[in-house]
Amino acid sequence: MENENQVIDMKKEIQIRKMKKSDLPQLQEMYRDLIPEGVSMEVLENNYYRTVDRPEYFLAVAADGDKVLGSTMGIVCIALDAPFLVVENVIVSGECRGQGVGRKIFEALDEFALKNQCEYALLVSSGFRKGAHRF
């Protein structure tokens, strides 16, 4: 049996891809770190369908095959002087924090921002997430 405390080098296997509906059950569990009271599958599905095909939204997961390791949402907003990116719901699974998943997520966000000519990005985070703020 594999040692649960073993650090696994997943850097080569991590893929950043568009979020799929089938990812939502795993995300629902991960979102408990973001929203302690949880979020219903109905809300997740409704908001997924409202945003997934909109070009100004970047809904992505970091995955190893079908296993979701992390997720994020980026939204391009248009100000009068220039577009900018709002980054929300960044989450990395506790079992793979510190192994490059968050870095790959932010690299993908950077690419999306550049593609959309964003001048800057704003990261939204809840005040209680002190551990995540160290990242």
What are these regions (language model features)?
Residues 1-22:
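Conserved N-terminal entry element of GNAT/NAT acetyltransferase domains
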Residues 20, 93, 126:
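Residue-level recognition of the GNAT/N-acetyltransferase active site
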Residues 92, 98-111:
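Conserved acetyl-CoA-binding loop-helix of GNAT-fold acetyltransferases
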Residues 113-125:
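Conserved GNAT acetyl-CoA-binding A-motif
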